[in-house]
Curated annotation (Swiss-Prot):
Known cofactor(s): Mg(2+)
Binding site for Mg(2+): 124, 126, 155
GO BP field: urate catabolic process
EC number, as in UniProt: 3.-.-.-
Family: Belongs to the FAH family.
SUPFAM superfamilies, per database record: FAH (SSF56529)
Enzyme class (EC, first level): hydrolase
Organism (species): Burkholderia ambifaria (strain ATCC BAA-244 / DSM 16087 / CCUG 44356 / LMG 19182 / AMMD)
GO function term, MF aspect, one: hydrolase activity
InterPro entries registered for this protein in UniProt: FAH, Fumarylacetoacetase-like_C, Fumarylacetoacetase_C_sf
Name of the protein: Putative hydrolase Bamb_4846
Length: 282
């Protein structure tokens, strides 16, 4: 299934794509794509519904983040060896874990706000993993059983706040609008191997990032198992799994960063695309 949330910010309704790619309203069956609705049992109930019997959503509504009430938004850094190289950092021996504040979450086509005074706002196309079942201390072999599905994430980052000012990465990762998620939550049964997905990103039509999840340092299963040893993962938690090379700060000889008035387009095979315009934060 391709599940989504549509409508004005803060008033999103749950939906599903039908066989023709049209949005159908799910709100008579589930209040939101959050919590227990993301469990195996919850998704099984949704899967039993024929989308053709659901109300058709007219027009072109705003698409919100594909998951509601996200409890934890967990980032993984330097998870592609060639990205670590372009960043001038060693390939990690353990996952680099940081937090993205849930207040950064927005829809896949909402605008990106360039923070006041920022000259180093950067892009990162990433595979997002949405937890469906509570898990703690799970084995790698069973880790994917706890996943509800997958989505596209743009891990927007302000490099001065992330790196140059010292301290933790979190503060450069969590500005408002720095977490576009979606458009769809694609359930795990439709993604047989999350380590075989092409992902890409363009700015103003120029392709900067081209990668495949097979080159991750730590696989999705390894990340879920690892994170479950140091925290309880809960339904609706989102793990954004790192980015391939081609970020702005790694461009030689001179880094390239986002400015107001630009267009960012990114996607992952089978998971949909995002399209964002950049603007100065007010």
């Amino acid at each position: 299934m391709k599940l989504l949330r549509y409508g004005p910010s803060g008033q999103e309704k749950p939906g599903i794509l039908d066989a023709n790619g049209r949005i159908r309203d799910l709100s008579a069956h589930v209040p939101d794509l959050a919590g227990d609705a993301l469990s195996d049992a919850g998704l099984t109930r949704l899967r039993a519904i024929d989308p053709a019997t659901l109300p058709l959503v007219s027009g072109e509504p705003r698409i919100g983040a594909c998951v509601g009430r996200v409890g934890k938004f967990i980032g993984i850094g330097l998870n592609y060896a060639d990205h670590a190289a372009e960043a001038g950092m060693p390939v990690p021996k353990e996952p680099v874990v940081f937090g993205k504040w849930t207040s950064s979450i927005c829809g896949p086509n909402d605008g990106i706000d360039i923070p006041k005074g920022s000259v180093k706002t950067d892009w990162e196309v990433e595979l997002g993993v949405v937890i469906g079942t509570t898990c703690k201390d799970v084995d790698e072999a069973r880790a994917l059983d706890y996943v509800a599905g997958y989505c596209v994430v743009n891990d927007v980052s302000e490099r001065e706040w992330q790196i140059e000012r010292g301290g933790q990465w979190d503060k450069g990762k969590g500005f408002d609008t720095f977490g576009p998620i979606g458009p769809w939550l694609v359930t795990r049964d439709e993604v047989p191997d999350p380590q075989r997905l092409d992902l890409w990103l363009e700015v103003d039509g120029h392709r900067y990032q081209n990668g495949n999840t097979r080159t991750m340092v730590f696989t999705v299963a390894q990340l879920v198992a690892y994170l479950s040893t140091c925290m309880t993962l809960q339904p609706g938690d989102v793990i954004t799994t790192g980015t391939p090379p081609g970020v702005g700060m790694g461009i030689k000889p001179s880094p390239v960063f986002l400015k107001a008035g630009q267009t960012v387009r990114l996607g992952i095979d089978g998971l949909g695309e995002q399209l964002q315009s950049t603007r100065n934060a007010r």
